[in-house]
């Protein structure tokens, strides 16, 4: 597994250096008005679905709100709509409002995020506009001063890590250390080891852990979700795609196959970015959904988090050309 992961990670970070592009240009595209109409329609649908219990809860009440609305979120297509609005449609409108300097569009999309928060109690959804705008400002500043953003982020993370290690003996330092190092960086590695040990003596899923595959094949060999099965019910944490779609699916071959799929996806992203006259738009629009790739199945990332939908929009919908043209290269 170590050798496979080494090759996979080298491929992951080296894709951008390979001058290979997929032919994805589409000549006839839909009007962007269609996206606005779909966004409004889904918003009205969700407001109707959650109409009995929507409120602007403070951070001490959000878990109660989540529990109260859990049945609504998990029923039918509601959960997908929540993710698609939070990861695709509202960010798309927000970014276009920022780049096109349209304050009305920006504030309407922010209202959309607030409505989603009132339905789900998810703090991440409420903070998405701030996170996206901060990334936009950082990217714009790095272009202005001609600084490599990747190197800047590496330096910032390194300095932040050193700072945390210096104050880890304090209560605040311990809390930040547990959140940053353990929850953000170490859980994926710990779960990978657990999955490797578990599937040495238990049957692989052969991708039947994916809901749609299991509905077609009925091959899923366990009675509960993978996160609970592997840990014997002790936890239910989402694992990295190399773990769920790799080790759990079919061992070594699973890691190899999902790595190939990931590389093809990255080639597709590079091809889409190359066709767009404003590649900063392409970079930022993937930010909300990109965070999900760190702790979920790649197929969940594509479908539930709306990445496949976002790619289809970039390929088949005419993005307005009056956005402020900023090129990163």
Q: Language-model segments: which ranges?
A:
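Internal alpha-helical transmembrane segments
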Residues: 97, 104-130, 134-171
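Short hydrophobic/aromatic segments of transmembrane alpha-helices and their interfaces
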Residues: 106-110, 236-238, 282
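Small-residue-enriched transmembrane helix-hairpin modules in multi-pass membrane proteins
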Residues: 62-76, 80, 161-267
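Short, hydrophobic/aromatic alpha-helical segments in well-folded domains
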Residues: 93-94, 113-114, 242-245
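Membrane-anchoring hydrophobic segments
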Residues: 1-94, 100, 140-164, 257-329
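Short, 15-30-residue, compositionally biased linear elements
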Residues: 103-104, 233
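Helix-loop-helix junctions and helix-breaking kinks within/between transmembrane helices
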Residues: 1, 111-136, 247-254, 296-305
């Amino acid at each position: 597994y170590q050798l496979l992961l080494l090759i996979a990670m080298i491929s992951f970070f080296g894709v951008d250096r390979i001058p290979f592009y997929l032919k994805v240009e589409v000549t006839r595209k839909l009007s962007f008005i269609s996206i606005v109409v779909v966004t409004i329609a889904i918003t009205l649908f969700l407001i109707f679905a959650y109409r009995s219990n929507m409120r602007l809860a403070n951070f001490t009440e959000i878990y109660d709100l989540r529990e109260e609305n859990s049945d609504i979120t998990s029923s039918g297509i509601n959960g997908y709509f929540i993710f698609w609005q939070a990861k695709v449609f509202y960010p798309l409108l927000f970014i276009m409002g920022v780049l096109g300097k349209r304050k009305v569009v920006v504030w309407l999309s922010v209202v959309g995020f607030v409505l989603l928060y009132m339905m789900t109690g998810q703090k991440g959804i409420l903070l998405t506009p701030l996170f996206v705008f901060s990334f936009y400002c950082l990217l714009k500043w790095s272009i202005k001063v001609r600084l490599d953003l990747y190197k800047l982020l590496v330096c910032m993370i390194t300095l932040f890590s050193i700072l945390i290690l210096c104050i880890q003996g304090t209560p605040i330092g311990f809390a930040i250390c547990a959140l940053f190092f353990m929850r953000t960086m170490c859980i994926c590695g710990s779960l990978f080891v657990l999955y490797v040990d578990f599937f040495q003596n238990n049957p692989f899923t052969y991708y039947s852990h994916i809901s749609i595959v299991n509905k077609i094949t009925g091959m899923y060999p366990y009675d509960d979700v993978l996160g609970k099965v592997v840990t014997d019910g002790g936890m239910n944490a989402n694992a990295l795609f190399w773990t769920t779609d790799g080790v759990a699916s079919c061992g070594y071959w699973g890691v190899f196959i999902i790595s190939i799929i990931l590389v093809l996806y990255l080639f597709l992203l590079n091809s889409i970015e190359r066709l767009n006259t404003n590649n900063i738009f392409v970079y930022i629009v993937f930010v909300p959904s990109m965070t999900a790739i760190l702790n979920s199945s790649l197929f969940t990332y594509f479908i539930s988090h709306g990445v496949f939908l976002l790619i289809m929009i970039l390929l088949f919908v005419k993005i307005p050309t009056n956005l402020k043209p900023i090129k990163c290269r």
